[in-house]
Curated annotation (Swiss-Prot):
Species name: Pseudomonas putida (strain ATCC 700007 / DSM 6899 / JCM 31910 / BCRC 17059 / LMG 24140 / F1)
Name the record gives this protein: Fructose-1,6-bisphosphatase class 1
Sorted UniProt keywords: Carbohydrate metabolism, Cytoplasm, Hydrolase, Magnesium, Metal-binding
Gene name, Swiss-Prot/TrEMBL: fbp
GO cellular component, one term: cytosol
Positions bound to Mg(2+) 1: E90, D112, L114
Main location class: cytoplasm
Enzyme Commission number(s): 3.1.3.11
Length: 336
């Protein structure tokens, strides 16, 4: 039986599920950009791409060289194809306007070009996260300037989301709203090949991922829940749990998709004015869409993440996602 490449899968989706051709082309362009980013990541010190730029992004985070390289690759790959009305990135203060010399399309692309980049210098898996939205009609005119407001749509409006993980293998995880597929990069063929046809998150789990060094700063519901996990068989949950923490959202979520678990990056008392650390638009929303499509759940502790109406492009949010039973338990603790 012949292998199914990403291109073939997308063409079949166009035929069977009426996936628009423009969306198919857009996903293929993003995938090609991810292949180029994978090449730079794999070169590491040999390519002179490790270390910091000496600058900060809009989040106040020090930019790694590969942050900037990856951001530029995604912009240059996607600006000219005629599929997009604009882009937004973790690494840019404002929305990116499609240059006037190129046609505008019907979609918006939002991305974290290199999630987990603080781990680059120690050779830990990192990745690219992306989300696709429809552009509101009022911004579709070639002469209409795009602003931040066009992007401020709840996660339920996403038409596609995915991530590439650059690890021992480079994989692309994708949802078009009808389940989750996994593609592995065949470097000899030069294509992403379908290797995981129906990714599902088990409803129950015995693993969780959280940064325990922040425990003293957590709110009471998270303190209670994690305390019960650590109590194991002798606690109220009557089960032993293992903790895993990579400090790369892509890597931690990928593990959960592969074998189940719970990922938590809750709000804490260090910065009371901020509702969390992770960004809603280009981290929490696409990952929540993927997790839900795989049968899991995602919450900020009180509300479904995909229902949150963004107020700003770089809005932060508390994130708890993964196996449905555990997400529901944490949510119940927050609401007591």
């Amino acid at each position: 039986m012949s292998r199914v490449t990403l291109s073939r899968y997308l063409i079949e989706q166009t035929r069977s599920n009426n996936t628009p051709a423009d969306l198919r082309f857009l996903i293929e362009v993003v995938a090609r950009a991810c292949k180029e980013i994978s090449h730079h990541v794999s070169k590491g010190a040999l390519g002179g791409v490790l270390g910091s730029m000496g600058t900060e992004n809009v989040q106040g985070e020090v930019q790694k060289k590969l942050d900037v390289i990856s951001n530029d690759i995604l912009l240059e790959a996607n600006e000219w194809g005629g599929h997009l009305a604009g882009m937004a990135s973790e690494e840019m203060d404002n929305a990116y306007q499609i240059p006037g010399k190129y046609p505008k399309g019907a979609y918006l692309l939002v991305f974290d070009p290199l999630d987990g980049s603080s781990n680059i210098d120690v050779n830990v898996s990192v990745g690219t996260i992306f989300s696709v939205l429809r552009c509101p009609n009022q911004y579709l005119s070639q002469n209409e300037s795009l602003n931040e407001e066009a992007f401020l749509q709840p996660g339920t409006e996403q038409v596609a989301a995915g991530y590439a993980i650059y690890g021992p293998q480079t994989m692309l995880i994708l949802t078009l709203g009808n389940g989750v597929k996994g593609f592995t990069l065949d470097r000899e063929l030069g294509s992403f090949v379908l290797t995981h046809e129906n990714i599902r998150v088990p409803e129950t789990t015995a693993e969780f991922a959280i940064n325990m060094s922040n425990q003293r700063h957590w709110e009471a519901p998270v303190q209670r829940y994690v305390g019960e996990l650590l109590a194991g068989e002798t606690g109220p949950l009557k089960k032993n749990y293992n903790m895993r923490w990579i400090a790369s959202m892509v890597a931690d979520v990928h593990r959960i998709l592969t074998r189940g678990g719970l990922f938590m990056y809750p709000r804490d008392a260090r910065e009371p004015s901020k509702p969390g650390k992770l960004r809603l638009m280009y981290e929490a929303n696409p990952m929540s869409f993927i997790i839900e499509q795989a049968g899991g759940a995602s919450t900020n502790g009180y509300d479904r993440i995909l229902d949150i109406k963004p107020e700003s492009l770089h809005q932060r949010v508390s994130v708890i996602l993964g196996s449905k039973e555990e997400v529901e338990r944490v949510t119940a603790y927050h609401k007591e």
